[in-house]
Regions:
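Conserved N-terminal entry element of GNAT/NAT acetyltransferase domains
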Residues: 1-12, 167-173
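Short amphipathic alpha-helical segments
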Residues: 1-2, 12-16, 89, 104, 122
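Acetyl-CoA-dependent GNAT
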Residues: 5-9, 19-29, 35-96, 107-109, ...
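Conserved glycine-rich acetyl-CoA-binding loop
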Residues: 67, 90-108, 115-117, 127-134, ...
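C-terminal "cap" of GNAT-fold acetyltransferases
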Residues: 86, 120-133, 137-139, 145-173
Length: 173
């Protein structure tokens, strides 16, 4: 497995992981019609923008064949007004690669990037029914607040977690 910073040529591979992992992660959480309508093409366009955006950092995990099997995205959301803070905006792996330490590797790269930026307080948003919340809790994230959101007509609970000292996370790797 290899983890590296993403380049524009990775957009299609990231989009495939994004769509496929949403379909498995959010099955029975987000309406099926919404998930089935997700498009590789539109997500490729999204990732072209995300990779190119200044202040946004995207990392990919590749298998031994060089195929992208996971990714993480981080930076600072426009809605984040806290000084010296950032946001983990996405971390997804294809289902068959979960539980093998790859997510940990991606999280480490994100936190090393935050350390380089001088960020010490990190936020991540996760749907309440998404089991990834336990991954964040394992690495020391604490619940900051909750809010209701609507996706495809379904009202869902969004949990906002925070890490308030990235050094405490980095020593776990």
């Amino acid at each position: 497995m290899n983890i590296r910073k993403a380049v524009l040529a990775d957009s299609m591979g990231i989009a495939k992981v994004h769509v496929d992992s949403w379909r498995t992660t959010y099955k029975n959480i987000i309406p099926a019609a919404f998930l089935s309508n997700l498009s590789y093409d539109s997500r490729t366009d999204l990732w072209n923008g995300n990779i190119s955006k200044e202040g946004n950092y995207v990392f990919v995990a590749e298998n031994s064949d060089g195929d992208i099997i996971g990714f993480a995205d981080c930076g600072k959301r426009e809605s984040n007004h806290f000084p010296e803070s950032g946001d983990l905006t996405a971390i997804y792996l294809l289902e068959e690669y979960q539980g093998k330490g790859i997510g940990q590797g991606l999280l480490e790269q994100v936190f090393l990037q935050f350390e380089e930026l001088g960020f010490n307080r990190i936020f991540v948003e996760v749907l309440e029914d998404n089991k990834t919340r336990y991954f964040y809790e394992y690495y020391g994230a604490e619940l900051y607040k909750t809010k209701k959101i609507t996706i495809a007509g379904a009202e869902l609970n969004l949990l906002i977690y925070e890490w308030n000292n990235i050094r405490n996370v980095l020593i776990k790797f």
